[in-house]
Amino acid sequence: MLDETLERERQFHNAWAAAIDVDGIRVADYFEACTAPENRFILKQMGDIRGKLLLDLGCGAGENSVYFAKQGARCVATDYSPGMVEIALQLAAANGVEIEGRTANAMALDFPDNTFDLVYASNLLHHIPDPKIALKEMHRVLKPGGKACFWDPLKHNPVINVYRRMASEVRTDDEMPLDINIVNYIQSLFSETSYDTFWIATLWIFLRFYLIEKVDPNKERYWKKIIIEQERLAPMYLRLEKFDGILKKMPLMKRFAWNIAVVAKK
């Protein structure tokens, strides 16, 4: 069953990789756009990464590794999909940086203990059959004092769950968004843990895509669209983000966000 799940994930992402045009990827937007609050949260806590050895788990098209390489990190980009690793290497070449690329299973990493200064993962854990195993592996390969930085979707918001059901063609059958209580496990594993959640009122943008702009969720990935069109969306997003800040101060509201971002120190 586990191998079958991983193989389905590999096939899905290989097919996606075959359709990616690296020339259209604006790397910095995935970290610096106002509509990338998860990565902005992570960047604030990463510190100076120049010369640091960074493992990018589930590297996808390589936006993360390329961005960090541009900041001076030595990046190892890994993905279970060989197609995605190849795209990441192409993106690095197109941006004039060097990264190492490897196919890897995040639940069984082929790296020694205490290897990396930083482990980064975006939208990975909800594709993993057992996220806790992947978290243990992140912890294992980090040097003492190293940081695991990652973000993923949560399962609790009814609006985003409707979107997930509609966008079946651009999602895998085995995806399992996280329960916010996984934070308790992360806190038990790492010496320090900081986290926040993002996108509550700001999810109005998804509703606008569907109800007003008539964007087919099976033809355009909304979570890519918010980055690609960040300049157009910025005025609306920034107004709604202020409301998110108010909502998250209310009891239990953080769990109804779309995404959670975590920085955990070994």
Show the residue positions of the predicted features.
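Class I SAM-dependent methyltransferase SAM/SAH-binding core
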Residues: L55, A61-A108
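Short catalytic micro-motifs in class I SAM-dependent methyltransferases
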Residues: N123-H127
